[in-house]
Amino acid sequence: MTPDRRHFLSFASLGVLGAALLGSCGGSGAEAAEHFPVRMSEAEWRKKLGPEAFAILRKGGTERPYSSPLNDEHRAGIFACKGCGNPLYSSKTKFESHTGWPSFWAPLPHAIGMRTDTVLLVPRTEVHCARCGGHLGHVFNDGPPPTGKRYCMDGLALVFHPKG
């Protein structure tokens, strides 16, 4: 290998490694420097949510697929943020995506916010609660009509309130 090629490959490798490290530090969920109407200390969130929901809502984690009982929730009602109670999705927009996570084709108006998530190096659109900033999941462009969107949510980030 020639010195020029060796230097190029070394610098290219460093660039990929640097991008990976920066991407893994990218804010997801409540970690970004945004201000939301509902705020608590980390200790207060931990106490309120418990370890599993805290890891998702406040640290941007993901639950195991097919682990949420909300996958099988088919009653009429509202899915709200477990962190602050903000109504997020109507059961009318829930659909079976066969991905293992509760999925919706549209949020309620002004319920969510979105930002680019580069944690896995491939940019994705992260979805968070507009009221508390809690990480909810991601949105993809492979959903059903009328929006063509799949809001793929972590069940541990949600609570269901039946209609009535």
Regions found by a protein language model. Name each.
Residues M1-L17:
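N-terminal secretory signal peptides and thylakoid transit peptides that target proteins
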Residues D72-S103:
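Mid-length scaffold segments of soluble, non-membrane domains
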Residues C81, C129-C132:
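Short cysteine-rich clusters marking metal-coordination/redox-active sites
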Residues G85, G133, M153-L156:
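Cys/His-coordinated zinc-binding microdomains
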Residues S90-S91, H138-V139, H161:
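Short, non-ligating residues that shape and space the ligands of small metal-coordination modules
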